[in-house]
C-alpha cells in the first residue's frame, strides 16, 4: 500500500441510474452489475450511509466528496450529475492514506490522531448544568459549532498531497480541520 503508487483508471458504463440514488447506491448498483458479469467489484469504504462517520470519503471529479460543499459522499445524490456525464472517482491520495485497493485507503494514521485527542475544545465559559442559563458570545458559539461539525472523514488531510491549482478539501474548512493538519505535517 503506497499513496504514491500508480493506479489505473477503469471505465464503466452505467444505465438506469436514478437521480434519486445516493452516490453510494450507484456504486452498489455498479458492483452488482460487475458481479453479474463475473468482474470483481470496486472496493470502497462505507459504514453509516448517513453522513456521520466519514468512511465513504473519496474524490469525485477532483473534489473531496464531490461537487456539493459540506456534503459527504453518502449524502451526494446522482441528480447533481447530468445524464451521460463521465464521473471520475479516486481514493483519497495522501501520504497519510496509503491506498489498499481501488477506492479503499488505510485510515489508521488518522484514527490514531483522533484516539490521541485530535480535537478542538472551545471554551464557552460554562458547564453542563449552566448551559441554558449563561449567554455565550456569538463568536465563541460559532467556533464551538464549527469544531463540532467535523465528522472525521479526513478530507482535510488530502490538502498535504494536493497538486498546485487544486481546490482545498470541499467538505471542511473549520477550526478542527486547521487543528488536525499540523499533526499530519510533523
Regions found by a protein language model. Give the residues of each.
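A surface-exposed, charged beta-strand/loop segment in the N-terminal or early-internal portion
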Residues: 69-95
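A common structural microfeature
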Residues: 11, 20-23, 45, 53-55
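Local cysteine-cluster metal-coordination motifs and their immediate loop/turn environment
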Residues: 42-79, 145-165, 186
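Ferredoxin-type iron-sulfur electron-transfer modules in oxidoreductases and energy-metabolism complexes
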Residues: 21-40, 87-186
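Eukaryote-biased recognition of intrinsically disordered, low-complexity regulatory segments
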Residues: 1-16
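Short, solvent-exposed loop/turn segments that connect beta-strands within catalytic domains
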Residues: 3-6, 64-68, 82-83
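Extracytoplasmic/periplasmic beta-strand context in beta-sandwich domains
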Residues: 10-12, 72, 87, 173
Amino acid at each position: 500500500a503506497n499513496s504514491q503508487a500508480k493506479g489505473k483508471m477503469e471505465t464503466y458504463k452505467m444505465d438506469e441510474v436514478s437521480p434519486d440514488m445516493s452516490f453510494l447506491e450507484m456504486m452498489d448498483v455498479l458492483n452488482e452489475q460487475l458481479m453479474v458479469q463475473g468482474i470483481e467489484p470496486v472496493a470502497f469504504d462505507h459504514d453509516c450511509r448517513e453522513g456521520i462517520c466519514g468512511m465513504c470519503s473519496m474524490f469525485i471529479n477532483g473534489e473531496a466528496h464531490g461537487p456539493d460543499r459540506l456534503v459527504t459522499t453518502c449524502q451526494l445524490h446522482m441528480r447533481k450529475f447530468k445524464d451521460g456525464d463521465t464521473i471520475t472517482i479516486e481514493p483519497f491520495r495522501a501520504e497519510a492514506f496509503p491506498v489498499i485497493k481501488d477506492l479503499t485507503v488505510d485510515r489508521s494514521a488518522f484514527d490514531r490522531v483522533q484516539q490521541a485527542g485530535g480535537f478542538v475544545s472551545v471554551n464557552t465559559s460554562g458547564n453542563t448544568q449552566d448551559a441554558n442559563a449563561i449567554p455565550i458570545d456569538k463568536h465563541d458559539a460559532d467556533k464551538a459549532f464549527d469544531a463540532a461539525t467535523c465528522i472525521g472523514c479526513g478530507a482535510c488531510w488530502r490538502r498535504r498531497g494536493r497538486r498546485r491549482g487544486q481546490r482545498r478539501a470541499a467538505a471542511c474548512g473549520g477550526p478542527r480541520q486547521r487543528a488536525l493538519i499540523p499533526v499530519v505535517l510533523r
